[in-house]
Amino acid sequence: MDKKEIFQSVTSMEEQLSHLYRQLVQLKEHVVQLLEENHHLQIENDHLRRRLEQVTSELAEEKQKEKDHKHGHERKLVDIGEGYDNLARLYQEGFHICHVHYGSVRKEGDCLFCLSFLNKK
């Protein structure tokens, strides 16, 4: 190899290193964006879980008040039926009963679709 070929080889490696460095910088920026987005989504998820718990407890309290009110006036409760009882039991055992995830195991707490189905009259 003569000096010119060595110089061209070094110049080529320098360009390749420069290109790899630019790619590394872009990748680093993308990772930062993903980490920020993940953090924001975790915060939003926590807020939604708290709101779901709040709404669920409010609905339970409201339902209890309504039930107490009906018993106070000696009204007969409508017999919901065996099918509803079976679905409620499945839900309590940890399975989805909603049309979206029917039959799959609930992994993270309550499901809004299932709860809305159970709260229908």
UniProtKB/Swiss-Prot annotation:
Top-level taxon: Bacteria
Cofactor: Zn(2+)
Keyword Zinc: yes
Principal location listed in the UniProt entry: cytoplasm
This protein's UniProt keywords: Cytoplasm, DNA replication, DNA replication inhibitor, Metal-binding, Zinc
UniProt keyword annotation of Transmembrane present: no
Co-factor binding details: Binds 1 zinc ion per subunit.
Subunit structure: Homotetramer. Interacts with both DnaA and DnaN, acting as a bridge between these two proteins.
Family affiliation: Belongs to the YabA family.
Job description of the protein: Involved in control of chromosome replication initiation. Inhibits the cooperative binding of DnaA to the oriC region, thus negatively regulating initiation of chromosome replication. Inhibits the ability of DnaA-ATP to form a helix on DNA; does not disassemble preformed DnaA-DNA helices. Decreases the residence time of DnaA on the chromosome at its binding sites (oriC, replication forks and promoter-binding sites). Tethers DnaA to the replication machinery via the DNA polymerase beta sliding clamp subunit (dnaN).
This protein's name: Replication initiation control protein YabA
Naturally occurring in which organism (per UniProt): Geobacillus sp. (strain WCH70)
Phylogenetic lineage: Bacteria, Bacillati, Bacillota, Bacilli, Bacillales
Gene label: yabA
